Structure formats: structure tokens, C-alpha cells
């Protein structure tokens, strides 16, 4: 099955503490989760590893969000949108369901 949300897509968070925030997807996980740039930040307690030159301390990093909690952002309408698939020139492409514009 083709992925409706892919890496480098601009998405908007639908639920949770970061509801309404926009960001770019940096990674799509096989478990049905995505990591969005600057969203769902958590603090991780990092142990120092002198052999690798890693300094210890409290580090902020992005945690995964379930795919169902984000929606692709349509810049033309300024809202979250749903994604459909169609064939153009024998290629399967994604498009926004609200205005039928092809997603690049």
C-alpha cells in the first residue's frame, strides 16, 4: 500500500499537547508513527560516553507521534487535508481531496 504521508511533507498536529502546530516530517517509522521537526519534544537524560566524545546531560529531542494524529497541510486552503491517489501519465500520484491539486 502506498504511503499517504511521506518524509518532507508539511503536516499539522490534530491532537495532543502540540495541537495546531505545523512541522516537516523527518522520519516515518514502520510502526505507524512519524517524527515531526520541532514537535513533541521530550527531555532525555543522556549518560556521558567519553570514548565517543559524548557529553552527558539533559537533551531535548523529538519523540514519535502516531500517523493518525497528524494530517497533511494544504498550503492553498491553509487547512489540514486528506490525501487520495490517482494515475497521471501512468504514474500513481497523491492529491489533496479538497481541491484535487497534485502533491509534489
UniProtKB/Swiss-Prot annotation:
Superkingdom assignment: Bacteria
Keywords: Ribonucleoprotein, Ribosomal protein, RNA-binding, rRNA-binding
GO biological process: translation
Gene3D superfamilies for this protein: 2.30.30.30
GO molecular function: rRNA binding; structural constituent of ribosome
Complexes and interactors: Part of the 50S ribosomal subunit.
Entry similarity comment: Belongs to the universal ribosomal protein uL24 family.
Primary role: One of two assembly initiator proteins, it binds directly to the 5'-end of the 23S rRNA, where it nucleates assembly of the 50S subunit.
Name the UniProt record assigns to this protein: Large ribosomal subunit protein uL24
Source organism of this protein record: Photobacterium profundum (strain SS9)
Amino acid at each position: 500500500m502506498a504511503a499517504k504521508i511521506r518524509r518532507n511533507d508539511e503536516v499539522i498536529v490534530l491532537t495532543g499537547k502540540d495541537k495546531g502546530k505545523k512541522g516537516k516530517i523527518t522520519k516515518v517509522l514502520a510502526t505507524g508513527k512519524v517524527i515531526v521537526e520541532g514537535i513533541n519534544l521530550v527531555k532525555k537524560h543522556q549518560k556521558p560516553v567519553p570514548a565517543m566524545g559524548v557529553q552527558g546531560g539533559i537533551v531535548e529531542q523529538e519523540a514519535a507521534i502516531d500517523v493518525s494524529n497528524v494530517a497533511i497541510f494544504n498550503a492553498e486552503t491553509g487547512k489540514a487535508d486528506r490525501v487520495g491517489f490517482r494515475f497521471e501519465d501512468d504514474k500513481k500520484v497523491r492529491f489533496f481531496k479538497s481541491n484535487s491539486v497534485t502533491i509534489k
